Amino acid sequence: MAEEIIDVEPSLNEDTKKTATKLLDRLASLEVARESWEEHWQDVADYIVPRKADFTRTRSAGDKRMEKIYDGTAIHASELLSASIHGMLTSASTNWFNLCFMNNDLQAIDEAKEWLEGVEHTMYAQFHRSNFQEQIHELYHDLITFGTGVLYVETDGENGFRFETRHISECFLAEDPEGRVDTVYRKYKMSVRSAQKLFGEEASSRINKLMKQDPHEEIEIVHVVMPRDDRDAEKISSENKPYASIYIDPEEKVIIKESGFDEFPYMCPRYLKASFERGYGRSPAMQALPDVKMLNKMSEVTIRSAEKQVDPPLMLPDDGFMLPIRTVPGGLNFYRSGTRDRLEPLQIGANNPLGLQMEDQRRQAINSAFYVDQLTMGVGGPMMTATEVVARTEEKMRLLGPVLGRLQAELLQPLINRCYNILTRQ
């Protein structure tokens, strides 16, 4: 864990306070720039991924989150697309990457090729041993729903990797002039006990004080990872590594801990991205959101209409001679013999088939946004030959070609580079 454990001594002098204040001011500007995205993400989460609906409002753990859902088409479609991309790009059952030398002359040397194959085998073993598969699936799901995923890669003790897909609500992104994300501010909460364990003797005075009072209280921490422009490249100390890693106590406005990374530890892929929008991407869930909201409203209305037909409102004479009315199964209601007054259901003239037909149209539009028909083509049919399987896979790859190209540049390539470099330092 070479890049993470070499730390500089924290200081409460004026320079570090000014640095902390400057970084927090930058965070404030990034928060303002992200406000419009948060409303959009909240809408998407409410209707398509309720378990992550914590942007403009938060709920306690275990709270019900499906109140707005009357139809689960979008939920299932998003899960299908994210699982399909997972299977195409980083399936645990296949070798999804190969290493090669940039120097073609080395590719012709058997000993060099054998060494590279050994490195590749070691990397696969580390990926399988780690939590990569569970975390990368969450990343793909974030891409499909929110348009932006954030994956953090660090070392796991002395050997191996550890991955963490971070909720986009915690992360504030900034790009370099080429449009690549090179700065991540993470604003999150952790218990005082966890903070004390993470920072040790370097913890701020507030953390040390709270540790004695209530170690289980949650506090806010800001973690900044950004390029270090003022470093001395000839030195290998943590304060001269290419990327700065700075933990800040935002309440006291002090730097708790400062270290560095040899590579950018975050992979921040975007599903689709407009050239004029900075930092964050757009998703098929955003494209389908109007249809999703309309379908939910249609389903709600259709359910109410069907309920009125199955258990219709009752028409009673205004003199109320039958009261009290018993509407339970087998209930007896008495009225005077010979009277023409009757207890009758109200005929509402509902047209449920039309409502169901319109719902199917919206479902088809949602499925089209998530490529459901193309991804499920041939599923449940007769057994396919190996050639047919390859042909179907290639068809899916062509369908998602533009998206997969962006993921290769923003996710897979930096991921492999980061993991390879971690192994070379161990």
Predicted regions and their residues:
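Generic detection of long, well-ordered alpha-helical segments
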Residues: 109-116, 129-133, 284-296, 356, ...
